[in-house]
Swiss-Prot record:
Its EC number is 2.7.7.6. Its main location: plastid. It is found in: Plastid, Chloroplast. This is DNA-directed RNA polymerase subunit beta''. One of its GO terms (biological process) is DNA-templated transcription. Its cofactor is Zn(2+). The gene is rpoC2. NCBIfam families: rpoC2_cyan. It comes from Panax ginseng. HAMAP family: RNApol_bact_RpoC2. DNA-dependent RNA polymerase catalyzes the transcription of DNA into RNA using the four ribonucleoside triphosphates as substrates.
Length: 1387
């Protein structure tokens, strides 16, 4: 007894808490040492001890035991403060909705986590024997987060869709919840209840499908004799030791393992914990183990490939139903896998980021060239470093160096003073490439109504060229200019023209007149005229005077710009052409589209005699090829294409070639240009009919004589239509050759006399020296009309010479005489082009002007179109042409009753110069203003057509005046940028005399605020030019039937004294965010757009900013009217697809059913290509293809196992790899026969076992074409050897009918078939009856011989590349670095 006591005294007393995992470890070690029976006795004693102690403790719980954490109050206050700041930033437009959501979730998550960590120390300090503390941290049941909900705060909850609700529950269950919090927490609770029910049924069904796939797999042999293995390597610390041990224990080695010359383990030895520890200490070379994947047969498994049975820790017995065990061990934990979707670590990020903190106080320095500014995912400014960055922190006595890895955010500026432990950088977490992320869309809706505006370039998404989806290239604001739209159909009628002022009592205000929006224009028009003008209504409108018209209506005609007429900007080397095609509606007749194109060089500079516009007359258009001729003998010299001289990209005329031509001729012929190698099916000089085959692919379109000419590398084949005359007939025609003969020339002949009705072309053809014949070819005659008709084409007003600019209309023929014209396919060829040529006269006073700057402004406003071609002679007054079209014309008679039949493509365009403008001002009440200062220093010009425009002259303040002058001297150029606006053109007028900032459109005239009162009386169709930060001018949409009520435009006024600092910051059209200081007397109060700048004040139109980051999609057009609740922007942001989003069961099921994942890592495709190249390069092409399918299968198997294990491990469930491997082996064991190359044994598209295909190939000694397929578990269950098993799973009738038709035989090898038919199941003891033992023993030695032979061959052929495979696989195919220990070996 004493001896025993003494022994006990020497024993180590293990004074530590033993939790669940420690208990598991203890039990497994006990089993190893003492065996099962002894261990169960020891465990009994432990159990008794536990119950005894628990009874003695007699623990109880009261509400007083729930101690709240004292620091909670200020933590929550701090978080609320941060949220408030965030809300304010969002309101100012500094962060957008997604950033705000992310940040608020992270703020609250951090708070909640911090509280949770405080909880345990708090208990330990205040009351270590608190029952809650003792029970919750014992490791028996319950976890910290549940206690946290009792005594900390409940924190963030998920809504029924699994999205986070960004309003956290601040109370805990001890304090009690408020009503809102209660409702939010009910979401979570309800989700929990539903999930549990759904989860149980899901897990049950998953188990059923799994067992179905593998029910027939039984251990049938001791050794299948395979030579394959999978390599597991503990090297380079890539995988945790725990996983390594778990992978190896219970497996069987596939190859001997050497340490230097010494063999430390032999083939077919099973691995226990001792051996594993030796492997770890020795860091041995890759260890090749046998797995179910490497077993020879798919319908059973051998003992050695399966390894130890998990129940008794020995090799599996023969006849053990390992398939069913595998299915159940994967299915059963399914009930434990949580389906909860709320997160354990930032929802929106791939794990929360790691921080780099400053080691001490000091000044921070880094190389600014290596970083570029960016935004973090929370919208904070930061620097992104693309390579390793060394940061030095200089404190008083010591210099610290900090290395920041690439792709990290630097959160401080250079030379900034940082304090110790301050966060200076954020390392991007989860940079593993195959961490799938899913893209989530978040829509931002407008919360006010008004006009949309954005202030950087916005590109059209190429997929939606004609739609309204735009992409943002850089971070910018979207603004909604507030205003109350008043929508009316009557605006579509022509009574309201743009720029009209209306009395508030006029008809569009009366609600009963605003007809339903669904009524089409015609109906509305009809209704309108019939009701209002028929005299039945008392308040009908008798004349236009009440409408207060400002514009004028003397348009020569009313045109409609067709809704779909797109602006084609054809890129020609260095200019762009804008054809203005309009379909003109004139008393219900549709006129053909005019096809006038204005041509502007990209740099916007015209020389003298440049062509500014041209018109392609459809009468002079041909589809076929041919030759042009001018007249008969005297050929006029005319402007040819070659004589247009290109000077800096501008076409210009040389006058010496301009001669009069009144008619020209076109001789059609069919031309085929063929490559020199092509075979021609017709002979030279033969005569063919229509639609004769010429070459293999082409047929003739006309009949006639064939001429074949061989050039250097091609053959030209021409077909001339016409009559053939042989010279036997004496006629004078045959003497001519290559002559045009006018109509009426007779051809006399003994038998007949014939007069030609049209012009003909006579050509003499000599096939041989003596013989010749004459071909008479038809000719198409074109008369070129002289100037009288041209006046109708271009507006006559244009052609009068004014002051010093002349425009002339010139016709020119594009092809010289006798030039062959080639038409390709169906393109039509324009023969004559009508051009508008610009010229100007030199002013004697001014120095000679060589260039004119031009720009093209296209403005669309409520169905009104203006085209301004602005031509600016540098030192003369500015000239404008305006083109006005009123699509809404409903047949109103123009005021001067002028004849409207004069359809005119350049309609009502005006060229103004000084004198002319003055006149037109008097006539038309101010269509265009030029504003000249007396001293002629600054000229400002506003393109407006109403007296509603206002002008800001040079300020009286001298300083400000200088600024303007300087800017004019600096850059008087007008740049023309070929970038897209709403119509396809947008233009920068910003530098135009710097007054271009003042271009507004149809502005309300507010010289002082009292005038606002008058505005209450009148409505007005309000549109502006919207100008963005780059000075581009955008024009609103033309289809908009919306009148903005100016009284509701939310103006506010701001007094400020102009001083040097402020005046320079204000420019018209500028947007101002909230709290931006623009005046001395404090910050600006509301965000908005500067509408009017006056000497002592500015008028600002209220606006609301929304921030948008690159990649966001903007909906709607520039200047469009938006209503509350319309979608403004869609953000696309990435959430990580880690274990949080599709978690647990759904994820496992997704993998096992081989469902596709929505988003695939971007670089995956490239990797696969690289991998394929790698294989063929190293092994040569035939081998590359041979092992392609094999490697695909092996690789996909490994990757599937890793994926499934990852899900289970993340939930803390331990499943041995071999169970998963058995199932994965079944779903990857079939291949799809891809060609009918298998000598009629298998059909293409048939699923056959991989091993069967290989054996068949060896037997037939020919290559077999098959491709690897992944079947889901359901599909694999329906593709087994046994139709009885299939039928008892799903689709019974279909399976049985098919089996009967095919005459399938069921060999009853599986368990299920035998259960269904009531036979003995072939497992356990019943297994002995199935395989005669004698045969089994004979087989093995024989196979071993083969094995060695085969092993040698395989080694020679493939696997001196073993290293290569390992490296390839680890590089290319692993989800996480953790798994790249598994390579592939086939030695």
């Amino acid at each position: 007894m004493e001896v025993l006591m003494a022994e006990r005294a020497n024993l180590v007393f293990h004074n530590k808490v033993i939790d669940g995992t420690a208990m598991k470890r203890l039990i497994s070690r006990l089993i190893e040492h003492f065996g099962m029976a002894y261990t169960s006795h020891i465990l009994d004693q432990v159990k008794t001890l536990g119950f005894q102690q628990a009874t003695a403790t007699s623990i109880s719980l009261g509400i007083d035991d729930l101690l709240t954490i004292p620091s909670k109050r200020w933590l929550v206050q701090d978080a609320e403060q941060q949220s408030l700041i965030l809300e304010k930033q969002h309101h100012y437009g500094n962060v957008h909705a997604v950033e705000k959501l992310r940040q608020s979730i992270e703020i609250w998550y951090a708070t909640s986590e911090f509280l949770r960590q405080e909880m345990k120390p708090n208990f330990r300090m205040t009351d270590p024997f608190n029952p809650v503390h003792i029970m919750s941290f014992s490791g028996a049941r319950g976890n910290a987060s549940q206690v946290h909900q009792l005594v900390g705060m409940r924190g963030l909850m998920a809504d029924p869709q699994g999205q986070m609700i960004d309003l956290p529950i601040q109370s805990n269950l001890r304090e009690g919840l408020s009503l809102t919090e209660y409702i939010i927490s009910c979401y979570g609770a309800r989700k929990g209840v539903v999930d549990t029910a759904v989860r149980t049924s899901d897990a049950g069904y998953l188990t059923r499908r799994l067992v179905e796939v593998v029910q027939h797999i039984v251990v049938r042999r001791k050794d299948c004799g395979t030579v394959r293995g999978i390599s597991v390597s503990p090297r380079n610390g890539m995988m945790p030791e725990r996983v390594f041990i778990q992978t190896l224990i219970g497996r069987v080695l596939a190859d001997d393992i050497y340490l230097g010359p010494r063999c430390i383990a032999t083939r077919n030895q099973d691995i226990g914990s001792g051996l594993v520890n030796r492997f770890i200490t020795f860091r041995a070379q890759p260890i090749y183990i046998r797995t179910p994947f490497t077993c020879r047969s798919t319908s059973w498994i051998c003992r050695l490939c399966y390894g130890r049975s998990p129940t008794h820790g020995d090799l599996a017995e023969l006849g053990e139903a390992v398939g069913i065990i595998a299915g159940q061990s994967i299915g059963e934990p399914g009930t434990q896998l949580t389906l909860r979707t709320f997160h354990t670590g930032g929802v929106f990020t791939g794990g929360t980021a790691e921080h780099v903190r400053a080691p001490s106080n000091g000044k921070i320095k880094f190389n600014e060239d290596l970083v570029h500014p960016t935004r973090t995912r929370h919208g904070h400014p930061a620097f992104l470093c693309s390579i390793d960055l060394y940061v030095t922190i200089e404190s008083e006595d010591i210099i610290h160096n900090v290395n920041i890895p690439p792709k990290s955010f630097l959160l401080v500026q250079n030379d900034q003073y940082v304090e110790s432990e301050q966060v200076i950088a954020e390392i991007r977490a989860g940079t593993s490439t195959l961490n799938f992320k899913e893209k989530v869309r978040k829509h931002i809706y407008s919360d006010s109504e008004g006009e949309m505006h954005w202030n950087t370039d916005v590109y059209h998404a190429p997929a939606f060229t004609y739609g309204n989806v735009h992409l943002l290239p850089k971070t910018s604001h979207l603004w909604i200019l507030l205003g109350e739209p008043c929508r009316s159909d009557l605006v579509a009628l022509s009574i309201h023209k743009d720029q009209d002022q209306m009395n508030a009592h006029s008809l569009s205000v009366k609600r009963r007149y605003i007809s339903n929006l669904s009524v089409t224009n015609d109906q509305a028009r009809h209704k309108f005229f019939s009701s209002d003008f028929s005299g039945k209504k008392e308040d009908r409108i008798t004349d236009y005077s009440e409408l207060n018209r400002i514009g004028h209506c003397n348009l020569p005609y009313l045109a409609i710009l067709h809704a779909n007429s797109d602006l084609l900007a054809k890129r020609r080397r260095n200019r762009f052409i804008i054809p203005l095609q309009s379909i003109q509606e004139h008393e219900n007749e549709l006129m053909p589209s005019s096809g006038i194109s204005i041509e502007i060089p990209i740099h916007g500079i015209f020389r003298k005699k440049s062509i500014i516009a041209y018109f392609d007359d459809p009468r002079y258009r041909r589809k076929s090829s041919g030759i042009t001729k001018y007249g008969t003998i005297e050929v006029h010299s005319i402007v040819k294409k070659e004589d247009l001289i290109e000077y800096r990209g501008v076409k210009e005329f040389r006058p010496k070639y301009q001669m009069k031509v009144d008619r020209f001729f076109f001789i059609p012929e069919e031309v085929h240009i063929l490559p020199g190698s092509s075979s021609i099916m017709v002979r030279n000089n033969s005569i063919i009919g229509v639609d004769t085959q010429i070459t293999l692919t082409t047929r003739s379109r006309v009949g006639g004589l064939v001429r074949v000419e061989r050039k250097k590398k091609r053959i030209e084949l021409k077909i001339f239509s016409g009559d053939i005359h042989f010279p036997g007939e004496t006629d004078k025609i045959s003497r001519h050759s290559g002559v045009l003969i006018p109509p009426g020339t007779g051809k006399t002949n003994s038998k007949e006399s014939k007069k030609w009705k049209n012009w003909i072309y006579v050509q003499r053809i000599t096939p041989t020296k003596k013989k010749y014949f004459v071909l008479v070819r038809p000719v198409v005659t074109y008369e070129i009309t002289d100037g009288i008709n041209l006046a109708t084409l271009f507006f006559p007003d244009l052609l009068q010479e004014r002051d010093n600019v002349q425009l002339r209309v010139v016709n020119y023929i594009l092809y010289g005489t006798g030039k062959p014209i080639r038409g390709f396919y169906d393109t039509s060829i324009q023969l004559v082009r009508t051009c508008l040529v610009l010229n100007w006269v030199q002013d004697k006073k001014s120095s000679s002007i060589e260039e004119a700057r031009t720009s093209f402004v296209e403005i669309r406003i409520n169905s009104l179109i203006r085209d301004f071609l602005k031509i600016d002679l540098a030192k003369s007054p500015i000239l404008y042409t305006g083109k006005r079209k009123d699509p809404s014309g409903s047949g109103l008679i123009s005021e001067n009753g002028s004849d409207r039949t004069n359809i005119n493509p350049f309609s009502s365009s005006f060229f103004y110069s000084k004198a002319r403008i003055k006149e037109s001002l008097n006539q038309n009440q101010g269509t265009i203003h030029t504003l000249l200062n007396r001293n002629k220093e600054c000229q400002s010009l506003i393109i407006l057509s109403s007296s509603n425009c206002f002008r800001m002259g040079p300020f009286n303040d001298v300083k400000y005046h200088n600024v303007i002058k300087e800017s004019i001297q600096k850059d008087p150029l007008i740049q023309i940028r070929n970038s897209l606006g709403p119509l396809g053109t947008a233009l920068q007028i910003a530098n135009f005399y710097s007054f271009s900032h003042l271009i507004t459109y149809n502005q309300i005239l507010v010289t002082n605020y009292l005038q606002l009162d008058n505005l209450k009386q009148s409505f007005q169709v309000l549109k502006y030019y919207l100008m963005d930060e780059n000075g581009k001018i955008y024009n609103p949409d033309r289809c908009c039937n919306i009148i903005l009520n100016p009284f509701n435009l939310n103006w506010f006024f701001l007094h400020h004294n102009y001083c040097e600092e402020t005046s320079t910051t204000m420019s018209l059209g500028q947007f101002i965010c909230e709290n931006v200081c623009i005046a001395k007397n404090g910050p600006h109060l509301k965000p908005g757009q500067v509408l009017i700048v006056q000497v002592d004040s500015v008028v600002i139109r209220s606006a609301k900013p929304y921030l948008a980051t690159p990649g966001a999609t903007v909906h709607g057009h520039y200047g469009e009217i938006l209503y509350e609740g319309d979608t403004l922007v869609t953000f696309i942001y990435e959430k990580s697809r880690s274990g949080d989003i599709t978690q647990g069961l759904p994820k496992v099921e997704q993998v096992l059913e081989v469902r596709s994942i929505d988003s695939i890592s971007m670089n995956l495709e490239k990797r696969v290509e690289g991998w394929n190249e790698c294989i063929t390069r190293n092994l040569g092409i035939p081998w590359g293809f041979l092992i392609g399918a094999e490697l695909t299968i092996v690789q996909s198997r490994i990757s599937l196992v890793n994926k499934i294990q990852k899900v289970y491990r993340s939930q803390g469930v331990q499943i041995h790899n071999r169970h998963i491997e058995i199932i994965v082996r079944q779903i990857t064991s079939k291949v799809l026969v891809s060609e009918d190359g298998m000598s009629n044994v298998f059909l293409p598209g048939e699923f056959i076992g991989l091993l069967r295909a290989e054996r068949m190939g060896r037997a037939l000694e020919e290559a077999i074409c098959y491709q690897a397929v992944l079947l889901g578990i359901t599909k694999a269950s329906l593709n087994t050897q046994s139709f009885i098993s299939e039928a008892s799973f799903q689709e019974t009738a279909r399976v049985l009918a098919k089996a009967a038709l095919r005459g399938r035989i069921d060999w009853l090898k599986g368990l299920k078939e035998n259960v269904v038919l009531g036979g003995m199941i072939p497992v356990g003891t019943g297994f002995k009856g199935l395989v005669p033992p004698s045969r089994q023993h004979k087989n093995i030695p024989l196979e071993t011989k083969n094995k060695n032979l085969f092993e040698g061959e395989m080694r020679d052929i493939l696997f001196h590349h073993r290293k290569f495979f390992d490296s390839c696989l680890s590089k290319n195919f692993h989800d996480t670095p953790e798994q790249s220990f598994i390579g592939f070996n086939d030695s």
